[in-house]
């Protein structure tokens, strides 16, 4: 007969459920330089203490689970657990807190944005004790930032490649975004580039559809680029969207672009995924291609004030994963974006070192050390009357994208492009002369209209067009 065995609780293990805060709420914790820090906007369910909710967020996004497990004794929780180290009530909101959580560096795979976000936001957002949860900001430690390649080239290298300095770059998204044949698409690209724009762009959902297969588009666009370069004497580019159903197909499209000799390609980094984007960024670094990033799907994640992730977090993820351009909103156009908040994450994209500034939504000081900067792209419902504000808000290191604001010109694409180029150069000259664009921008544009019929026609078409709605995502 087999001997009877008796199960006893060991000295280091007691089965059952205990409050998260007993292990994961540590207000006395001293944050380490190597820690990854997160700021969550947290709304507990009625009756749930904020300390318990903050601890639950730390636990469920690191080492914890709903009950005590005996395998806790096989590792060091003090070394690996996340810690909620501070709770801050949100002013003007009832039962809402900013929970600050510190994660040890060893929890994350080096150079993997996918692993970082799988851990921090992968599971905890569905936790029943929380009514809502939003990741407002992350502090990426220097030690972790150094494990990423980041953008393939960065702002300075891009300007050297294009030989364009002292002004914002100008672009245009080809419209209609779907339905054009490859030949007509290439014709639209050529007209915009010869008119004075630096770039044209595939829209985010232009991949390889029956009406225009990707290889046909690439060939006609390359022809348009070379023809416009020969006519203008300037380097031109088109963001050829390499986003595809598989990583293999994506890299095949990138290789085709490289062989055609075009300067830049494009990727939808949220719908395509961080792993695919990082792979493409490495390919672009190795083969001399610039990488334009579209943020399609971002508003599903970031638009609601109480739940999801703020775009500043998505922007940081892109700087780590890799991209030379990133759409960032316009402040003045048709898409959501408060001025101070937008400028906060634009600085996080471009600058090497950014101080904590709660007035702009920046919860942590961020040091990017070796990672190149990302050029913000202002796109969505902008036209020539917006140019003074755009130059004043974004400065030189930005790409201003006028889709309808180019193709909607009453005289055609090339005059529309010329109108935007003239408006941009007039605003830059006025700024360099010391004029205040926020106050005098309208006068600057009207003065330029006197010698530019293309600009005058554009100003007449869009003189009454405004997008004035209350911003949803405010500080």
Swiss-Prot record:
Modified-residue entries (N6-carboxylysine), positions: 201
Pfam family of the protein (one): RuBisCO_large
Annotated transmembrane regions: none
Catalytic reaction annotation: 2 (2R)-3-phosphoglycerate + 2 H(+) = D-ribulose 1,5-bisphosphate + CO2 + H2O; D-ribulose 1,5-bisphosphate + O2 = 2-phosphoglycolate + (2R)-3-phosphoglycerate + 2 H(+)
Residue numbers carrying N6,N6,N6-trimethyllysine: 14
GO biological process: photorespiration; reductive pentose-phosphate cycle
Principal location: plastid
Record EC number: 4.1.1.39
Necessary cofactors: Mg(2+)
PROSITE patterns: RUBISCO_LARGE
UniProt GO molecular function: magnesium ion binding; monooxygenase activity; ribulose-bisphosphate carboxylase activity
Residues annotated to bind Mg(2+): 201, 203-204
Post-translational modification (record): The disulfide bond which can form in the large chain dimeric partners within the hexadecamer appears to be associated with oxidative stress and protein turnover.
Family: Belongs to the RuBisCO large chain family. Type I subfamily.
Assembly: Heterohexadecamer of 8 large chains and 8 small chains; disulfide-linked. The disulfide link is formed within the large subunit homodimers.
Function: RuBisCO catalyzes two reactions: the carboxylation of D-ribulose 1,5-bisphosphate, the primary event in carbon dioxide fixation, as well as the oxidative fragmentation of the pentose substrate in the photorespiration process. Both reactions occur simultaneously and in competition at the same active site.
NCBIfam families (UniProt xref): PRK04208.1
Name under which the protein is recorded: Ribulose bisphosphate carboxylase large chain
Taxonomic lineage from the root: Eukaryota, Viridiplantae, Chlorophyta, Ulvophyceae, TCBD clade
